[in-house]
Amino acid sequence: METVLNHPLFMPVLVTLVIIAAFPLVAGYIVLVERKVLADFQVRLGPMRCGPHGLLQPIADALKLLLKEDIIPTDSDKAIFWFAPCISTITGLVAFAVIPFARKIYVADVNVGLLVISATSAVGILGIILGGWSSNSHYSLLGALRSAAQLVSYEVALAFALLSGVMVAGTLSMQGIVQSQADRGVWGIFANYGFMVVPFVLYIIAATAETNRAPFDLPEAESELVAGFHTEYSGFRWALYFLAEYANIFVISSVAVTLFWGGWLRPFSSVAWLEKPLNYGVPVILFVGSGLLTFTLIRKVVDPMQQKVLLGVVVLLVLIGAIMAIPMVNDAMIGLFWFLVKVSVIIYTMIWFRGTFPRYRYDQLMNIGWKIAIPVGMASVMVNAVLGMLGKH
């Protein structure tokens, strides 16, 4: 057993299996959080029927999608129609291979990891284009063409934002980028006298557009294109596009955290006396406090079964908080904790965009991409180059 645990392939294989097994569930609960947050913005409750406070809604949605009839349009290109969603989903999941979730939790440390993620995101758009074209529908084709044009427009700005981060870190390796921030003792967003805030904001805008999220969701604008590129999809194949979208959201959030927010590093990582308060106090207070807050909701639930489910959630949260107080467990998992907290903040920000901003017109979308985002990206690269040279002298 010890030989297996010490094998160099053990951790990569384990992380891969966990990602494949857990991501559909994680994506489902990201959707639940999105629905709850948007409901809160609109002074509503959101899903409340399935389980206490809607906690089982993602499972109900998954069962519904798996049991729905899978309809294939008569005049569609059936082979491509079937395969297109798989392209988007597979490329979305492949990007997870080079993301460092913690110091020792990753699948592969590739020396061009950032380039791999950029390549997979570009290839993933083929799934959308092929899906829209093979559907033999005007709505789907227009949505696919919009998606392609949007990718071309914002991929350049995204590349400039990433290039600024790479210039500061001095490497394309995702592990190396985090290590460079650890060596400097400051997150990437504060590098070059704080100017890296500009590439960070540019990255968030361009990445939101590239993943077709609101307010840049023109490829699936329901008021114009019914459902855009996946108008003709239903059931399991539609669910694959759905998984691909949320896989890409998680990936771009992970890249933002790795490049600009220190990856798995805790806040103020260079301040030694804050290590125990942040690494032990924050997770314990967060999980135990969430458990106690959930406990206060039990008496508001009438159904005995839902009360038992909530009680189980309370026990689980308190147990996780207690386990995180164990030094050996904390040392192994604290990096993953901070990484997921930071990623959650980015995802919440993207949900906030959806609930706040109206959808742009197509000409406005192109103007922002070509006349604002790309020039700002080019300028930020040049300014960061100058500041980097000044910092060395």
Swiss-Prot record:
Q: Which UniProt keywords apply?
A: Cell inner membrane, Cell membrane, Membrane, NAD, Quinone, Translocase, Transmembrane, Transmembrane helix, Ubiquinone
The transmembrane residues are 13-33, 79-99, 112-132, 158-178, 186-206, 240-260, 278-298, 309-329, 333-353, 368-388
Q: What class of enzyme is it?
A: translocase
| One of the protein's GO biological processes | aerobic respiration
Catalytic activity as recorded in UniProt = a quinone + NADH + 5 H(+)(in) = a quinol + NAD(+) + 4 H(+)(out)
The text of the family note is: Belongs to the complex I subunit 1 family.
Please state what the protein is called: NADH-quinone oxidoreductase subunit H 2
**Which species does this protein come from?**
Solibacter usitatus (strain Ellin6076)
Q: Source organism lineage?
A: Bacteria, Pseudomonadati, Acidobacteriota, Terriglobia, Bryobacterales
